[in-house]
Design a protein with these regions (language model features):
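General beta-strand structural signal in soluble alpha/beta enzymes
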Residues: 1-3, 32-36, 76-80, 107, ...
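N-terminal phosphate/diphosphate-binding loop that engages ATP/GTP or pyrophosphate donors
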Residues: 1-56, 60, 65-68
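Conserved nucleotide-binding/hydrolysis micro-motifs of P-loop NTPases
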Residues: 6-8, 113-114, 142-143, 172-173
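Beta-strand-loop-alpha "switch" segments that mediate conformational coupling across diverse proteins
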Residues: 44, 157-174
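Short, surface-exposed amphipathic charged segments that create phosphate/polyanion-binding patches used
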Residues: 50, 150-151, 174-175
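Generic hydrophobic alpha-helical segments
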Residues: 62-66, 119-122, 171-175
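Short, high-confidence coil segments that cap the C-terminus of an alpha-helix
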Residues: 69-74
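Conserved catalytic-core segment of NTP-binding enzymes
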Residues: 75, 80-164
Length: 175
């Protein structure tokens, strides 16, 4: 597993919440620096947070590190940061990182109002950029759904040919 850059990390000497969850879920033996090379305090797009903190995100180093992880593992998940079109480093977007690695995308969507537009735009951008799409999933579906949350999966399924792979419930605590 890898999260190339995580922002909004209270203590950048440790893993942020996302990277820590990835490490735990994968039972990974990789070091914190391998899993999340750039941990940034400011809750901003990675390149913006890095600039605020006077840190330079080395895009080529990230690619090399990702390729080493991919080459040494049978299965690898690389979690993006903020979305496909979020600036990662300099003029490079998360989409550029995905394209360079040639990995299929799993688009993770929130079920709330606005997700149909957000998800379709992401899938459209990925297709336009020639990125392979494994599918999409709705994450953190609440037990008590709003009408928008209740209709999200069906609405998306009628508007895209990409595969809905899962609808995962919101869980609390140690569930």
């Amino acid at each position: 597993v890898m999260k190339p850059a995580e922002s909004g990390v209270a203590n950048p000497t440790a893993l942020g919440q996302d990277a820590a969850l990835l490490k735990w879920a994968a039972n990974s033996r990789l070091s914190n620096d391998e899993i999340a090379p750039y941990r940034l305090k400011a809750a901003l797009a990675p390149s913006v947070a890095a600039a605020e903190e006077k840190i330079r995100i080395d895009y080529n180093r990230l690619l090399q590190q990702a390729r080493e992880i991919i080459d040494s593992h049978e299965f690898t998940i690389i979690e993006g940061a903020g979305g496909l079109m979020v600036p990662l480093s300099g003029g490079f977007l998360m989409a550029d990182f995905a394209a360079a690695l040639k990995l299929p995308l799993l688009v993770v969507c929130r079920p709330a109002l606005g997700t149909v537009n957000h998800t379709l735009l992401t899938l459209f951008a990925a297709r336009t950029m020639g990125l392979p799409i494994a599918g999409y999933m709705l994450n953190r579906m609440p037990k008590q759904k709003t009408l928008a949350e209740e209709k999200a999966a069906h609405t998306l399924a009628t508007l895209t040919t990409d595969e809905l792979l899962a609808v995962l419930p919101d869980v609390e605590g140690d569930e």
